[in-house]
Swiss-Prot record:
It comes from the Bacteria. Its main location: membrane. It comes from Mycoplasma genitalium (strain ATCC 33530 / DSM 19775 / NCTC 10195 / G37) (Mycoplasmoides genitalium). The chain crosses the membrane at residues 12-32, 201-221. It is a multi-pass membrane protein. This is Uncharacterized protein MG280.
Amino acid sequence: MVIFINRFSKTILLFFGMLVFVFLLGFGITALYFRSTAANLYVQARNSIDSSFNSAKAFANALANSANQFSKSSITNNLDQVKKDLEQSLQKVDEYKKNLESQNNLGNISQEKIRELDATKKDLENSKTQLDNFKNNLDKNGTASSSPSVKKQATADGVISAVSEFSTQAQSIVSSYEKIKNNIPSSEQFNNYYDVTMITIVAVSGGMLAILITTIVFSFLTSKKRGLIRFSRFISTEQLADHVNDILDRYPDLEEEVITALDHD
């Protein structure tokens, strides 16, 4: 019974061992067969990661710039356009004044019209000067007024501070994301790792299967059965006798029965 259990346990272990190596061998061969498909899937995944990183980085950079520019960027663009329109108006006023003066020389235009035109030109020039001062103050202080109220300034400063703080956090997250992304293998590295790993799996599992099968075949061809026990064909008579003596020493009652049976024979 003990011999049967021992042989059965070894058979089960051998069977499951071979099953595991057969699975690994099949997995490795299948993976090598679909190597190009795996490479394409990895490239798509890597491109998706790169795209999402670039989007996140662009957002973080835009956010960082907006912390200093959001309070004046849109105003500055509009002021430039207004200033351009004022300069065009002044140019037209000068042209109109020259035309009036030429008409005045002919006695067709009164001095009152020219004075009204001069007043209009002066108003435009004052507006242009105020606009320049307004824009310069905006570029210098980042606010639309040289003397903003305390409440409005505190609100603006609070918004800028909040945006700056969030921008710092976003930059930190993007930096950590970039470190992780840089540690992800490139497509070339992935192909190398993939090939080496799968070839190793195939070689090791195939080699172990070959060893197990060779061992089983060799054991079967070089063994002989004596009763319930199978011995190697290369075992000597002395080794067999020693083995029997070990069994008899372990079971004294059995030894007496064997000796009695031999005596009767």
